Amino acid sequence: MQLFHLCLIISCTCPTVQASKLCLGWLWGMDIDPYKEFGATVELLSFLPSDFFPSVRDLLDTASALYREALESPEHCSPHHTALRQAILCWVELMTLATWVGNNLQDPASRDLVVNYVNTNMGLKIRQLLWFHISCLTFGRETVLEYLVSFGVWIRTPPAYRPPNAPILSTLPETTVVRRRDRGRSPRRRTPSPRRRRSQSPRRRRSQSRESQC
């Protein structure tokens, strides 16, 4: 199995630092968390059960349908696009290596061990990575982080004291917007009086003009 790890690192041609984190951190037990720079952690993702994440094929189809142009672009779009590219490339290399091992390893038991290891361990990690970055691009990073925290609280709460259904990611943005709107404004400010509009100073009008250009 150590030989398999070494071959995997050598064959993984992802060119950036994030890819090195993915391969080296997970395979050699280094304390490197590929989610830290995005405000999450491996532990936070681990609250989600393994069957929560779609298959790699479904996630790749989703990434291609939604973000193919950006992923194929030579431009730097966002850190999430970059991490998504690297996760896809690492999965391609994993599949290539697994196919090669399956075709060249004579011992059936060893061959099954390699295939199962890739599908079970690395497959889950790739599914988590793909889901996280696709979700951040689709719903926004803050929404995804809020969802992970909400799910973690829900799953750790005894069944007798929690709602019957887990939080749903697609319903969080609407809730978040309403919450921020309620916190940020009062009804009085929403409808200023006519006298207030007439008494605006030139300085205030200039600042509003600048804001409207953003």
UniProtKB/Swiss-Prot annotation:
Task: Write out the propeptide range(s).
Answer: 186-214
From the UniProt entry, list the residue stretches annotated as the region HBEAG. 25-27
Question: Which keywords accompany this UniProt record?
Answer: Disulfide bond, Host nucleus, Host-virus interaction, Repeat, Secreted, Signal, Viral immunoevasion
- Compositional bias (Basic residues): 178-207
Q: What is its main location?
A: secreted
The biological processes this protein is annotated with in GO are:
microtubule-dependent intracellular transport of viral material towards nucleus; symbiont entry into host cell; viral penetration into host nucleus
Instruction: Locate the site labelled Cleavage.
Output: 185-186
* One Pfam family per UniProt: Hepatitis_core
GO molecular-function terms, A-Z:
DNA binding; RNA binding; structural molecule activity
Q: Which GO terms describe its cellular component?
A: extracellular region; host cell; host cell cytoplasm; host cell nucleus; T=4 icosahedral viral capsid
Question: Subunit notes for this chain?
Answer: Homodimerizes.
Q: What is this protein called?
A: External core antigen
The organism named in the record is Hepatitis B virus genotype A2 (isolate Japan/11D11HCCW/1998)
Taxonomy of the source species: Viruses, Riboviria, Pararnavirae, Artverviricota, Revtraviricetes
Gene that codes for this? C
